[in-house]
Amino acid sequence: SDYSIWKYLEGTKEASDPSTAWRALDFDDARWREGQSGFSIGFGNYDAPTRLWGMPRVYPSLFLRKKFTLEDTGWIQSLVMRVDYDDGFVAYLNGTEVARRGLAGEPDQPVPFDAPAAVHSRGNPELIDLAPYKLLLEAGENILTVQAHNSTVLSSWFAFHVELLANVVRGPFISATT
């Protein structure tokens, strides 16, 4: 849903060792915090549900995890990630990189927790077509993980909100006539 509960970890260091382990479905995130989707420092005009008051001058990034269950993936026609962000992010679906904005590197190249993002202002959500990645989805449990970054640890502007949207089509349907 639009404002579902996510697990998150403040980016004061790498989220795991090795640095990519946190992206896995079976990663133990029991010590991570929980917050409603829509994360921000709380300054400016973005009234996000989860406020990160301690972020400025302390940590430059945020690690996010959201598990979700699908009964059947065969009916999914389209898959779109709607994301509004300030400043950059990398998103992974079931451990595979599916989108990167404002952060240097090649696909699936790990991004250090303290990497600066290019400056980008929120307010114009981007729709990213993930149809090429819908085969990554499995019947049962799946996970969307995101590493969201600020432009600098000193910046007092940070915001991140994401939704994964699927168009499900069932049919064709045949009705019996009497």
Regions found by a protein language model. Give the residues of each.
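Surface-exposed, low-complexity/disordered Ser/Thr/Gly/Pro/Asn-rich loops and linkers
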Residues: 25-65
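Aromatic-lined ligand-binding clefts that engage carbohydrates, nucleic acids, or primary amines
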Residues: 6, 32, 60, 68, ...
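Acidic glycine-/aspartate-rich tracts in secreted/extracellular proteins
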Residues: 9-16, 26, 38-40, 72-74, ...
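An acidic-aromatic loop/edge-strand motif
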Residues: 104, 114-178
